[in-house]
């Protein structure tokens, strides 16, 4: 079995109009999938290399272990239903996880009526997802990328990387709460297992698998600031087929910030999430997914000094298709996950400015202008694991991606190939060492090996100590290499490399409380910033090593069957070189939840302190550099089929902003832009299930 698996190629071929996966010759894909998946033939050499490495590792491990292939009962089988996203990619007990992992459950998502990833991630320690205002019009901004420890994080859906470029910009703008089992957040570099752009960490949205029977739901909600949402959802299974279909229309209008200033905004968003699965046998699943979000939008920029209101409009569209094959053999401790992801993202932004305003360097005139940004992303990845014996488990894989901006002139494509290997070794009863290596070939740049080491020690069943060191190596984005309408190209820019060292503890205090504490240090070379060049700017590498240090505490307590709380604290300090840090020095979050019978209520408080350091509140574009925001929610189920819900955001009508910007005018003065977030706002709705 080992030799036959290792010598086979992880690719597809056409045979009598049916595609066959070489790893499992007895399993055939449905005919309609053949054409879509034939592209992986181009990557045959990459996967053959992976399999050659796999054969040597497996045979060597088999000989060393004396041919023992017993499956360790305490180590659960790797599959998407049970996987906890950690630095080891192994489903383990929370105490034994040699990493800092934060879990958001499906109940939390549904009870608190989260509408997007930004809302759901606010309570995660070290998370700093920032938006310009309410986010409309800035879906492509770096602020839209979830940030962990001041570095962007990779977003996965069922293990599938959703990145649309090397800066990890992703298309997970909206989520369907009914389809999510949990969201697991791994903090710290995880590039060896999850790709070179997993610098800050990994956010894995794990969806539910097949439910017995058929379930449907319709939901309507309405609020101030023009908010409306119409949603219909259907999911279930019949025989070997299972599915989930979600359709939603969401509208939003002008909003007022906490000081009463009106911000002209308009959003009309159509969302569709469709998933079909086929269970070929008790070991193999095939899944096809389509995710779409089409948005027409208008937004504004308010200039504080001049009083100018610049009104803009545009559209933002996402269309993604994902194909997955998931093989799990629990009896033999073996499995394989293979996926193909094809994403299309288009943004059209039309700017309408005051023609009398102009930047000091002449790089941008405040007049009517526009830009179109269209990216085609393709990613194919394969991951195979094998339980060798009670002590050893290996995981090996290969990945290819390419991103293409169809509107860039000249060379407009970046790509990356990589192979990776990981070994999990249990030794001396209470120790576990997980080590890995990935060889990355980022397009035209030199290839590089990056490594990871996670050592866990469990002196007691309720206590886990760990130390981890993980490296990363990520190539510049398309805009940094090829330029944009504001930036000149820089073909000489270099990839960024670095490492994160972390020490932590996971402590199950008793049956009702849990504590995670960790400290980390990240060092980075060839960080990327920008300088002026003529009438434009240019991205360049920063000299010296940038260092970021942090401390995180997360505490959970279930007081009784009704009351529970989550508390977290994050502190960071750094010597950022040549670049302004946008990570607050201190972030505090408090969750208090109460559930009894038909009622669920709760409060969430988020405090951020010293957002921009000593930068004069980023030239006065922020109302304050420190703030507390409190949200509240309530749900009531008069019957098992009906749920009435309400949510209030910014309960105390705080005037605050997560992002700032400014422009230097020709007369030398500074005009700051007001990106204040929404003031007190509410949402009420009803959901009917049948």
What are these regions (language model features)?
Residues 40, 46-55, 59, 71, ...:
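Conserved C-terminal beta-signal and adjacent last beta-strands/turns
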Residues 73, 305-330, 373, 464, ...:
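Outer-membrane beta-barrel signature, preferentially recognizing the C-terminal barrel domain
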Residues 93, 118, 122-160:
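Extracytoplasmic beta-strand/coil segments of soluble accessory domains associated
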Residues 117-120, 141-146, 171-176, 185, ...:
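N-terminal periplasmic accessory domains that precede
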Residues 160-187:
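Short acidic/polar hinge/loop motifs at secondary-structure boundaries
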Residues 204, 212-213, 221, 233-316, ...:
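Periplasmic-side early beta-strands and strand-to-turn transitions of outer-membrane beta-barrels
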Residues 296, 303-304, 409-411, 443-448, ...:
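Surface-exposed extracellular loop regions of Gram-negative outer-membrane beta-barrel proteins
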Residues 426-432, 520-523, 542-616, 643, ...:
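Gram-negative outer-membrane beta-barrel transporters
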């Amino acid at each position: 079995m080992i030799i036959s698996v290792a010598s086979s190629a992880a690719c597809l071929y056409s045979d009598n109009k049916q595609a066959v996966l070489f790893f499992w010759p007895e399993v055939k894909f449905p005919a309609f999938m053949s054409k879509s998946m034939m592209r992986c033939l181009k990557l045959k050499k990459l996967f053959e290399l992976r399999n050659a490495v796999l054969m040597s590792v497996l045979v060597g491990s088999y000989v060393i272990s004396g041919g023992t292939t017993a499956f360790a009962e305490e180590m659960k089988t790797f599959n998407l239903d049970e996987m906890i996203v950690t630095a080891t990619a192994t489903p383990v007990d929370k105490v034994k996880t040699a990493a800092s992992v934060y879990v958001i459950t499906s109940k939390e998502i549904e009870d608190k009526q989260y509408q997007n990833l930004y809302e759901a991630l606010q309570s995660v320690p070290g998370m700093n997802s920032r938006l310009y205002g309410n986010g409309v019009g800035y879906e492509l901004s770096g602020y839209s990328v979830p940030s962990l420890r001041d570095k962007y994080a990779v977003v996965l859906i069922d293990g599938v990387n959703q990145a649309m470029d090397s800066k990890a910009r992703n298309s997970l703008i909206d989520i369907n709460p009914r389809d999510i089992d949990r969201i697991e957040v791994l903090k710290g570099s995880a590039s060896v297992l999850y790709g070179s752009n997993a610098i800050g960490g990994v956010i894995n949205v794990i969806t539910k698998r097949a439910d017995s029977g058929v379930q449907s739901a319709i939901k309507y909600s309405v609020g101030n600031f023009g908010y409306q949402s119409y949603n219909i959802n259907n999911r279930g299974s019949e025989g070997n087929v299972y599915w989930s279909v979600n359709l939603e229309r969401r509208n939003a209008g002008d909003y007022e910030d906490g000081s009463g200033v009106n911000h002209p905004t308009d959003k009309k968003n159509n969302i569709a999430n469709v998933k079909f699965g086929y269970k070929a046998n008790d070991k193999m699943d095939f899944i096809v997914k389509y995710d779409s979000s089409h948005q027409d939008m208008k937004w504004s920029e308010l200039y504080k000094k001049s009083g100018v209101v610049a009104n803009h409009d545009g559209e933002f569209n996402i269309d993604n298709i994902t194909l997955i094959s998931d093989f799990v053999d629990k009896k033999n401790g073996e499995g394989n996950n293979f996926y193909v992801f094809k994403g299309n993202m288009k943004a059209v932004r039309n700017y309408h400015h005051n023609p009398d305003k102009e930047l000091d360097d002449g790089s941008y005139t405040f007049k009517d202008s526009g830009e179109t940004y269209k990216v085609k992303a393709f990613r194919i990845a394969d991951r195979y694991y094998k339980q060798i014996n009670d002590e050893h488990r290996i995981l090996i894989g290969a990945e290819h991606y390419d991103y293409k901006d169809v509107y860039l002139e000249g060379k407009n494509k970046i790509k990356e190939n990589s192979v990776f290997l990981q070994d999990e070794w249990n030794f001396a009863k209470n120790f576990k060492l997980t080590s890995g290596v990935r060889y990355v070939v980022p397009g035209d740049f030199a290839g590089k090996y990056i490594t990871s080491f996670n050592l866990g020690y469990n002196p007691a069943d309720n206590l886990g100590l760990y130390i981890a060191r993980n490296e990363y190596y990520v190539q510049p984005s398309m805009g940094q290499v090829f330029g944009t309408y504001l930036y000149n190209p820089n073909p000489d820019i270099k990839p960024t490399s670095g490492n994160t060292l972390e020490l932590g503890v996971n402590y199950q205090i008793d049956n009702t409380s849990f504590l995670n504490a960790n400290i980390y240090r990240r060092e980075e070379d060839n960080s990327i910033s920008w300088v002026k060049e003529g009438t434009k700017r240019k991205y360049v590498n920063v000299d010296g090593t940038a260092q970021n240090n942090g401390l995180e505490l997360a505490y959970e307590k279930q007081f009784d069957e009704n009351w529970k709380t989550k508390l977290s604290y994050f502190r960071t300090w750094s010597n950022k070189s040549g670049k302004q840090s946008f990570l607050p020095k201190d972030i505090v979050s408090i969750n208090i939840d109460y559930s009894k019978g038909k009622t669920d209520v709760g409060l969430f408080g988020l405090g951020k302190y010293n957002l921009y350091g000593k930068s004069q509140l980023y030239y006065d574009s922020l109302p304050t550099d420190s703030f507390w925001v409190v949200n509240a929610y309530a749900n009531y189920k008069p019957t098992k089929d009906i749920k009435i819900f309400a949510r209030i955001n910014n309960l105390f009508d705080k005037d605050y902003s997560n992002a700032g910007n400014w422009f230097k005018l020709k007369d030398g003065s500074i005009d700051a832009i007001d990106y204040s977030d929404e003031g007190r706002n509410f949402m009420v709705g009803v959901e009917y299930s049948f």
